[in-house]
Swiss-Prot record:
It comes from Methylobacillus flagellatus (strain ATCC 51484 / DSM 6875 / VKM B-1610 / KT). It is found in: Cytoplasm. (R)-pantoate binds at Q59, Q151. One of its GO terms (molecular function) is ATP binding. GO terms for cellular component: cytosol. This is Pantothenate synthetase. Pathway: Cofactor biosynthesis; (R)-pantothenate biosynthesis; (R)-pantothenate from (R)-pantoate and beta-alanine: step 1/1. Belongs to the pantothenate synthetase family. Catalyzes the condensation of pantoate with beta-alanine in an ATP-dependent reaction via a pantoyl-adenylate intermediate. Gene3D superfamilies: HUPs (3.40.50.620), Pantoate-beta-alanine ligase, C-terminal domain (3.30.1300.10). It comes from the Bacteria. Keywords: ATP-binding, Cytoplasm, Ligase, Nucleotide-binding, Pantothenate biosynthesis.
Length: 278
């Protein structure tokens, strides 16, 4: 089946009328194997797979890389065709925001921590565009990656608190053989930085091993790990051990945990996380 490219909301709604099993995979394009894994998960679960490609200006801060974000539509469409997607929704900014978007979704306070602390307003922009996409596509299933763990948590809350009839499917983080999490931003790394970038995942694995061997002094583990990366030239935004169910800082009563990190190699901000149990 040939991939359909649809840029207009009205045309997409007309095409989807009568479909009784729709999966949505929202992306900003510049697709890699991590995105394609999400499309394949969607393909297994739904009769009609819609991938959106939209570089959402609401989720970029004043000093972030909106204008420089790679736009690779032809290559993306070839990958989506091969992965079995049915439709790619490619709206313009004018199509998604014909007037100033004065109505916004305000996420819970957790959105101001972790990645939200360094990127104020980011998750407002994410939640708002995802709600718009949910309303436009009206999917039965939506697929998001676990690499953006905080985003996944906020979207699950969006669905729960607004009673949206959508099943959220979480795709496992896809990695290079070195352990580096696949990311569109990896393309910004030079060879030396890419070699060093492997260390982020290795550091998280060491934290998991440390905790599972009985060390429960989470603040000390976080501080030591941040100091270790800083001494190696990283600029660390955060390393944080949290409850994977509430995303609040982990207490000794929590058994399902996630360690999350964001740190920069040069100008490139990398994020990663590992879920684990104790």
């Amino acid at each position: 089946m040939t991939l359909q490219i649809i840029p207009e909301i009205s045309s997409l709604r007309a095409r989807l009328a009568g479909e009784n099993s729709i999966a949505l995979v929202p992306t900003m394009g510049n697709l890699h194997a991590g995105h394609i894994h999400l499309v394949e998960l969607a393909r297994q679960r739904a009769g009609c797979v819609v991938t959106s490609i939209f570089v959402n200006p609401l989720q970029f801060g004043a000093n972030e890389d909106l204008d420089n974000y790679p736009r690779t539509l032809a290559e993306d469409c070839a990958k989506l065709q091969a992965a079995g997607a049915d439709i790619v929704f490619t709206p313009s900014v004018q199509e998604m925001y014909p007037t100033t978007q004065t109505m916004r979704i305000t996420p819970p306070p957790i959105a101001n921590e972790l990645c939200g602390a360094a990127r104020p307003g980011h998750f407002d922009g994410v939640a708002t565009v995802v709600m718009k996409l949910f309303n436009i596509v009206q999917p039965h299933i939506a697929v998001f990656g676990k690499k953006d763990f905080q985003q996944l948590f906020i979207i699950r809350e969006l669905v729960r608190q607004f009673n949206l009839p959508i099943d959220i499917i979480a795709g496992e983080t896809q990695r290079e053989h070195t352990g580096l999490a696949l990311s569109s931003r990896n393309g910004y790394l030079n060879e030396g930085q890419k070699l060093e970038a492997q260390r982020l995942y290795r550091t998280l694995k060491l934290i998991v091993d440390n905790v599972q061997q009985g060390n429960r002094d989470y603040p000390a583990i976080e501080a030591q790990s941040s100091q270790y990366l800083t001494q190696l030239g990283w600029i660390v935004d955060y390393i944080s051990i949290r409850s994977s169910t509430t995303l609040l800082p982990a207490s000794l009563d929590d058994h399902n945990l996630v360690v999350l990190a964001a740190a920069r190699q040069g100008n490139t901000r990398l994020i990663d996380n590992i879920e684990f149990s104790v």
